[in-house]
């Protein structure tokens, strides 16, 4: 059963990578957008964009 869980996690991770790479290719004309910004956009909660997170 653990193998199934590992495969599911790998599929989710690869799907996120595909989303990031697709967004990166779609915005290739904008040099301002880096892969780090895209990762933040996908993985950070919405409050991070507004600066209201309590860290």
Swiss-Prot record:
One of its GO terms (cellular component) is extracellular region. Keywords: Amphibian defense peptide, Disulfide bond, Secreted, Signal. The keyword Secreted applies. GO terms for biological process: defense response. Residues 1-15 form the signal peptide. Its main location: secreted. It is found in: Secreted. It comes from the Eukaryota. Expressed by the skin glands. Disulfide bonds join 47-53. The keyword Signal applies. Residues 16-41, 54-55 form a propeptide. This is Riparin-1.4. It comes from Crinia riparia.
């Amino acid at each position: 059963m653990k193998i199934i869980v590992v495969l599911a996690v790998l599929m989710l991770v690869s799907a996120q990578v595909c989303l990031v790479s697709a967004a990166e290719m779609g915005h290739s004309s904008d040099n301002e957008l880096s892969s780090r910004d895209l990762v933040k956009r996908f993985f950070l909660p919405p409050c991070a964009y507004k600066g209201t997170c309590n860290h």
